[in-house]
UniProtKB/Swiss-Prot annotation:
Taxonomic placement: Bacteria, Pseudomonadati, Pseudomonadota, Gammaproteobacteria, Candidatus Palibaumannia
Matching InterPro entries: Fe_traffick_prot_YggX (IPR007457), Fe_traffick_prot_YggX_sf (IPR036766)
Keywords: Iron
Organism: Baumannia cicadellinicola subsp. Homalodisca coagulata
Reported function: Could be a mediator in iron transactions between iron acquisition and iron-requiring processes, such as synthesis and/or repair of Fe-S clusters in biosynthetic enzymes.
The protein's name: Probable Fe(2+)-trafficking protein
Length: 77
């Protein structure tokens, strides 16, 4: 059973994620502050970015671009 958290993206209490979806300290921050609903919205946006920009996730440059976009989307919206 998931815990409720204050989601900084939705700006309200919401169901937290079941597990840490992203590695490292950033992943811990996302797990503690981003709800399941907000993470699902990011996954949709991420898919659009990958397709529209023809990103190659093997490329460090493309992965770094995607990570910056994720931070902007989740924490600066």
């Amino acid at each position: 059973m998931s815990k409720n958290i204050y989601c900084v993206f939705l700006r309200k209490q919401a169901e937290g994620q079941d597990f840490q979806s992203y590695p490292g300290e950033l992943g811990k921050h996302i797990f503690n502050n981003i709800s399941k609903e907000a993470w699902a919205k990011w996954q949709q946006k991420q898919t659009m970015l990958i397709n529209e920009n023809k990103l190659n996730l093997i490329s460090n440059t493309d992965r770094n671009f995607l990570e910056k976009e994720m931070i902007k989307f989740l924490f600066k919206s």
